[in-house]
Amino acid sequence: MLTLRKFKITNPYAGVDWDSWHHYKTNLHTHSTASDAQVDFSDMIKAYYDAGFDILAMTDHGVVNHGWNQKPRRIPVLSVSSIIKKPTWLSDEEYSAILDGTYKNRGRGMTDLRYGIEINTAVFTKAHA
């Protein structure tokens, strides 16, 4: 025997004033010379900053992002590409200026989403521009 139940569906966003919310330009999947891209780690971050992004996650193959001002940390043996071309990272001054928006006087900062990594790590070719 089939029993019908009555459900009441409520919109959890009914009380949200959408006019007061902002949109954030975000990239959650970015590669650099720390793995299989041809653009240097620090240059990639600056390019996204210059393009007006608010949030950026560096997610290189087999490389953990511990902060844009820290040397990208390879997982030994699994990350081969960055052995060929050594990535550079931001200075502490550049890092602070990008975070708070004073780098090139943009007026708003860009958030560093740390601990990004792409887990398929054994990449031997430069697959990204």
Regions found by a protein language model. Give the residues of each.
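Active-site microenvironment of metallo-dependent hydrolases
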Residues: 1
